[in-house]
């Protein structure tokens, strides 16, 4: 560790939970922000706030050693641990900004017809494939996306990985997939031209235009098009390695087109990223000179590495958070920061037909949960603030989610997030940092009494156990 490493190192601690390399690298490497988006993209970029210190040129982060990547072919993986690495090495049609909205990547602009059933993507003309050493190996055109799409929806080639989005949304993609299933081993000989002849709703009018025809109007297709199902693949590389070879290509064999390359990789130990010298976005985006990911056995080790200045950030265990937050003079009290929310929602799902251990129906619970007033007591009276604090001790109520999905999953054509539309329809208030939205200005005493009266009348006894 040299002096420059020490001086330029910003210090911050993350609250709790696991953070993926994809979000960290992409945010600074260009995969999550871009210019050149069209009106239909609704894109907006947010520059990083300065803390007054020298910017980091090298970034040292971590990952759990049980989340090591297992695939180098992004088309043949559905594992987030793989995507955390691979989406920094390979770009697709679109990416997303820090708010989850699609922004330009290899497609520099896009639009759709009036009913959003046909989407046209206009590709950059300066995107190249390169090998692991940064040597240019080919030029990317619309053909590479045809090859990639055919690979994904060909059951023999990609073994059904990443098929759900194209099969659900693209015209005749499901029929073509079923066709490859029927062909069996013979599907290995199919090419993208066979896919086009079959009538699958994807075409390339020229080298830098790609058109998708959806089964039905699909106003959110730009959010779909950024997924790995629609990433490009090189026909030359597939022919060079063969189907099995490409499917299970190694780090040294694969070709790349993203903002970073892997400089060094030691399985379940470390991996380091360096800028891809051939990346099309090099002049428009800032990138770290190096990113090193250390694989950790546990958070205790990670905290020690942070204290030794060997990591720039680390997630904390609940006990460590408590220790720091309970001591305003703690050396790390001013280094705590909140984690960016992930696009997952956690929910209560009631069992309306519960059985006892002996196999008999749990009538007491089943009657209670069938009562609307009983369920509303849960909805309007359950304050989970202390539970949220186990994840976010700084602002626990930032964890509250009163919707079926999380923010950033989808939005309307005006750029308004789906959860905001639901919030308005339900009459929910906004986050205030003090009280849960569901329990705000609500006195459930009358509701509780109503539930108890109604349940007592049908023989329910209290307390109700589940």
Model regions: which residues?
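Bacterial lipoprotein signal-peptidase II cleavage site
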Residues: 29-40
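N-terminal low-complexity, Pro/Thr/Ser-rich intrinsically disordered segments
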Residues: 41-59
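Mature extracytoplasmic/periplasmic domains
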Residues: 236-238, 390-419
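N-terminal lobe/hinge region of extracytoplasmic solute-binding protein
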Residues: 61-114, 255-256
């Amino acid at each position: 560790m040299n002096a420059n490493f020490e001086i330029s190192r910003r210090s911050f601690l993350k609250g709790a939970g696991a953070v993926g390399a994809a979000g960290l690298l992409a945010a600074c490497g260009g995969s999550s922000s871009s210019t050149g988006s069209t009106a239909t993209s609704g894109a907006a970029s947010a520059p990083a706030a300065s803390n007054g210190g020298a910017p980091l040129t090298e970034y040292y982060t971590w990952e759990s050693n049980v989340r090591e990547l297992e695939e180098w072919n992004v088309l043949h993986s559905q594992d987030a641990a793989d995507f955390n690495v691979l989406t920094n090495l390979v770009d697709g049609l679109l990416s997303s900004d820090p708010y989850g909205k699609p922004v330009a990547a290899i497609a520099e602009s896009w639009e759709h017809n009036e009913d959003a059933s046909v989407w046209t993507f206009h590709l950059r003309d300066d995107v190249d494939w390169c090998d692991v050493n940064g040597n240019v190996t080919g030029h990317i055109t619309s053909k590479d996306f045809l090859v990639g799409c055919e690979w994904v929806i060909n059951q023999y080639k990609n073994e059904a990985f990443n098929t759900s989005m194209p099969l659900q949304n693209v015209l005749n993609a499901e029929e073509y997939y079923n066709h490859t299933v029927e062909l069996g081993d013979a599907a290995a000989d199919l090419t993208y031209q066979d896919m086009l002849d079959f009538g699958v709703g994807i075409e390339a009018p020229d080298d830098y235009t790609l058109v998708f025809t959806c089964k039905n109007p699909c106003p959110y297709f730009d959010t779909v098009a950024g997924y790995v199902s629609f990433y490009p693949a090189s026909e030359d590389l597939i022919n060079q390695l063969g189907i099995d070879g490409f499917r299970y290509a190694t780090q040294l064999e694969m070709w790349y087109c993203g903002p970073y390359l892997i400089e060094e990789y030691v399985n379940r130990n470390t991996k380091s990223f360096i800028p891809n010298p051939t990346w099309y976005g090099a002049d428009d985006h800032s990138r770290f000179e190096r990113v090193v990911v250390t694989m950790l056995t546990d958070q205790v080790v990670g905290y020690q590495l942070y204290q030794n200045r060997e990591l720039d950030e680390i997630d904390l265990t609940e006990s460590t958070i408590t220790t720091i937050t309970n001591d305003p003079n703690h050396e790390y009290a001013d280094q705590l920061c909140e984690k960016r929310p992930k696009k997952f929602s956690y929910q209560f799902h009631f069992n309306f037909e519960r059985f006892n251990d002996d196999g008999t129906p749990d009538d007491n619970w089943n009657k209670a949960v069938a009562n609307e007033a009983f369920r509303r007591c849960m909805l309007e009276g359950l304050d989970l603030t202390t539970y949220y604090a186990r994840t976010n001790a700084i602002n626990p109520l930032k964890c509250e989610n009163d919707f079926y999905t999380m923010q950033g999953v989808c939005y309307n054509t005006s750029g308004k997030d789906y959860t905001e539309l639901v919030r308005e329809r339900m009459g929910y208030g906004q986050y205030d940092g003090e009280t849960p939205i569901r329990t705000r200005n609500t006195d459930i005493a009358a509701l509780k009494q109503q539930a108890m009266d109604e349940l007592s009348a049908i023989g329910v006894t209290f307390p109700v156990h589940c």
